[in-house]
Amino acid sequence: MIIRSPESEVKIMVDRDPIKTSFEEWARPGHFSRTIAKGPDTTTWIWNLHADAHDFDSHTSDLEEISRKVFSAHFGQLSIIFLWLSGMYFHGARFSNYEAWLSDPTHIGPSAQVVWPIVGQEILNGDVGGGFRGIQITSGFFQLWRASGITNELQLYCTAIGALVFAALMLFAGWFHYHKAAPKLAWFQDVESMLNHHLAGLLGLGSLSWAGHQVHVSLPINQFLDAGVDPKEIPLPHEFILNRDLLAQLYPSFAEGATPFFTLNWSKYADFLSFRGGLDPVTGGLWLTDIAHHHLAIAILFLVAGHMYKTNWGIGHSLKDILEAHKGPFTGQGHKGLYEILTTSWHAQLSLNLAMLGSSTIVVAHHMYSMPPYPYLAIDYGTQLSLFTHHMWIGGFLIVGAAAHAAIFMVRDYDPTTRYNDLLDRVLRHRDAIISHLNWACIFLGFHSFGLYIHNDTMSALGRPQDMFSDTAIQLQPIFAQWVQNTHALAPSATAPGATASTSLTWGGGDLVAVGGKVALLPIPLGTADFLVHHIHAFTIHVTVLILLKGVLFARSSRLIPDKANLGFRFPCDGPGRGGTCQVSAWDHVFLGLFWMYNAISVVIFHFSWKMQSDVWGSISDQGVVTHITGGNFAQSSITINGWLRDFLWAQASQVIQSYGSSLSAYGLFFLGAHFVWAFSLMFLFSGRGYWQELIESIVWAHNKLKVAPATQPRALSIVQGRAVGVTHYLLGGIATTWAFFLARIIAVG
C-alpha cells in the first residue's frame, strides 16, 4: 500500500467579476458617498467631493474593498508616471538639441523646449550654444540618456512610444484588477510572498537587468563617446549585444566568455566591473564600470534576500515570528502585535514606507552632487542645484506625509483594547516625557544656534570683528565632521585598499576634477560658518519632528481633550462650549508641521546653493588657478544674519530681478507671480470664517436684488478648508519663488 502525503491545494486568490463596470456610476459625481451623491446644496459640496474622493476609508469599512481600490489606484499612478516619462522622452526626440549636446557637452547647454513666437515670448529662447535657441533645461535627462547609451533622437522616439504603450497597459491593469479579477484580502496580507517577489523580482532582477544593460550597451557606447567618436559612427546597441567580438575589442575579458566565472577567476572581469572610486576625469561623473559593478552586487544581494521568507515550500523566515521574537530586556512585549497592525492598517504601512522613502530621497539629494552619477552632470551647475533642491523638497513632503498617515492610523485603526505593553503602547505611555524633552531640545537649539548669529551681528555692527565667531577670530570648528571627512579621505589606503580613490572627492585629500575648464568637484572645506548653519539645521529639523510627533502621540487623547479619538482626524475646535481647543486635531499638527518643514528645507537649500557657489563651483585657468563663482565669501559672510540677507538673498537675487528683457525674463515673472501666490495664502491663514461669511451674505443680497442668485448657496470655506488652501498656496508660492531665484541666478552665472 502506498501512502501519499495529501496534495496541497492551490488557494484561489482572486474574485472573478466582483464589480461591474458602469459608466453611469462614473458620471455621477460623489457616487461613493450617499450625502455627496445627492448633488450640491451649497458650495461646500465641491470641497467635500475633493476631500473624500480618495479617502477610501470613508467609502466603506470593508478592508478587502479598500485594499482593491488602493491597488487599482496604484496602476493609475503608474500610468501617469509612464505618460510623464513618455512626454520627457518625446520632448528630447522632437524639440531638443540632444545630438548637438552629445557631440560637445562642455560648450552646449541642454535644451528641450522651444517657445512659439506669440506675443513676443520668443525672447525666452536663449542661445544655449551650437546655434540652438531654446529654454535651458535643468532636469538631468540629457546626462542620464548619455549614461544609458542613447545616441540619437530616434531611440528617444521609440522609448517615448514604448512608455505610452506601458501607460495604456497600466490603465488596463487598474481596470482589470478591480472589475475583472480582483485579489482577495488574503493576497494583500501575504507579506512573505510579497517580500520575496518585490525583493527578488523588482529589486533583484531589476538591478540585474540594469547591470546587464550597462555592461552590454552603456559601457561600450560611452567608451566610444569619451574617445570622441561621432555618435553616428558608433555601432547600434543590438550589435554589441549580439556580437561578442565587438565587445571583446573594448573589454578583452569578454573573449573568455563565462570561463572565469565558473573557474572563480573573477578578477579577470575587472576591466568592466571595476572598484576605482572617485570620478572619471573625462566626464566628471562616477566611473560607469563602478556603477555596473554596483548594480550587479546589489542584484546578487536582493536575489538572495528574495529567497529568505517562508511561502509555499515551508522553509524560510516567517515575519510574524521575527517580530514577536523581537524583545529586549527593557521593551516589554516588544513588537508583539505589530504584524497584525501592519497587515490590517494600510495607513500604518504607508507611514513607515513614506518615512523610509523620504529619508532615502534626502540621501539621494546629497549623493547627486557628492558622487555625480552621470557624465557631465557635475559641470552643469543649474542641473546640480535643481536636483538637490528637488530631492530635498520631495523628501521633506514625504516625511510629513509619514506623520500624517501615522496619525490617521492612530485615530482610525489603532485599537487600544488589544494592545498592552508592546513597544507602541510603551511609547504612548511615556509620551509626555518624550515631548517635553524634545521641546527642551528645541528651545536649547533655537536659542543657542540663533544666539551665535545674533552675537556675530552685534559684534559686526559695533565694529569688533576680533570678537566674532569666525575662522579668523573665535573659531568654532566642526571637528567631528572634519574627522569623518578625513577618515573617508584616507579609506583607500586603509579600509578599502582595492579602491584607487575615496568614494567622493568632497571628503578631501584628492585633487580636484575639472572638465572643460569648469570645476566638477573638489574637497569641500568645513569651518565655523558651516558649524553655525548646521545648528540651524538641527534646530529646524527638531522643531518639525516635535510638531509632527506630538500630533501622532496625542492623536487619540490628551490632557486637554481626553476623547480626541471620537472627534476624528481633522476638526477645527472641540465644539463651541470649550475655548482654547482649536488647532489640536492630528490634521492641524500636519498643517503646522508643513510650515516648519518648509523652514527646514529652505535653510538647507540656501546653505547648499551658497556653499557650492562659494567653495566648489567655478572656472579653472590653464595655470590651474580656480576662480569660484562668489569667490569663497561663504566662510566670512554667512556668519551673520545680515550677511545672509545682503550677500546671499539680495546679492544673488540681482539676476532674477534684472532679468526683464532677457531670455531669463520668465523667471522674473515667476519670481513676481510666486511672491503673489505666497502672499495670497496669508489671506486664508490670517482671517476667520465669519469674516468671509458676512461678506458673502452681502454679495448674495446684491445678487438677489438683480435676480441672478445661483441655486447653489455660497458658503465660506470651513476652518480646516481655509487652512488647507492657505498652506497649499504658502508652500507653492514659496517653492516657486525659490525656484525662480535659484535658476535665474545659476543659469546666468553658471
Swiss-Prot record:
It is found in: Plastid, Chloroplast thylakoid membrane. One of its GO terms (molecular function) is electron transfer activity. Chlorophyll a binds at residues 683, 691. InterPro entries: PSI_PsaA, PSI_PsaA/B, PSI_PsaA/B_CS, PSI_PsaA/B_sf. Gene3D superfamilies: Photosystem I PsaA/PsaB. Its EC number is 1.97.1.12. P700 is a chlorophyll a/chlorophyll a' dimer, A0 is one or more chlorophyll a, A1 is one or both phylloquinones and FX is a shared 4Fe-4S iron-sulfur center. GO terms for cellular component: chloroplast thylakoid membrane; photosystem I. One of its GO terms (biological process) is photosynthesis. Disulfide bonds: none annotated. [4Fe-4S] cluster binds at residues 573, 582. NCBIfam families: psaA (TIGR01335). The PsaA/B heterodimer binds the P700 chlorophyll special pair and subsequent electron acceptors. PSI consists of a core antenna complex that captures photons, and an electron transfer chain that converts photonic excitation into a charge separation. The eukaryotic PSI reaction center is composed of at least 11 subunits. This is Photosystem I P700 chlorophyll a apoprotein A1.
